[in-house]
Amino acid sequence: TAKTFNERMQKLESHIYELAGEKFNIASPKQVGDILFGKMQIMEKPKKTKTGQYVTSEEVLQSLRSKAPIIDDILAYRGLKKLLGTYVEALPKLINPKTGRIHTSFNQAVTATGRLSSSDPNLQNIPVRDDDGKEIRKCFVAEPGCLFFSADYSQIELRIMAHLSGDENMI
C-alpha cells in the first residue's frame, strides 16, 4: 500500500540524513551530488554534466555502491519513490468505474522496430524483478475462471508477418 511505501521511504530518508549529517532534497540530483561528491567526497574526480553539476544517475551510483552505505539507501529511496508514483498511487486512479478494470491501449505502428507498445498506462512495463515489483504485479488478478497469459516471443511480429505473407525468404 501507499502507506507502507511512505513509511519505508521515511525510514530511508532519516537514515540518509543521518549518514549525510544534514537534511537535503533526496529527489534533487544536484543536492545528492553536492552531498556525495562535494561534502562526503566519496570519489576523487566525479563526472559532471555540461552545466557543472555532479552526475548522480543510477548507473553512476550503482558503480559507487561499495564506497559509502548512503548510496544503497539513496538508490532504494529512488526505487520506492518511482514505484509509489508510477504504480502504487497512479494505477488505482486509472480504474474504469464502469468495468472495475484498468484498460490500456496497444499501439501497432508507433515503434521503429514494429513491435507493439502499450500506453495509458503502459502495462508492458509493470515491474517484476524485485520483491516490491512482484507485490505490485500481484494487484492484477484475473476474474474467476479466467487467467492471464504472458508470452515473450522473439520477433513475434516478424514471424507472424512471414507466416501470413507466405514469403519463402522470410520463412
Residue positions per predicted region:
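Conserved "right-hand" nucleotidyltransferase catalytic core of DNA-directed polymerases
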Residues: 1-131, 141, 145-147, 154-157, ...
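A short beta-strand element within the Helicase C-terminal
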Residues: 160-161
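Conserved divalent-metal-coordinating catalytic cores
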Residues: 169-171
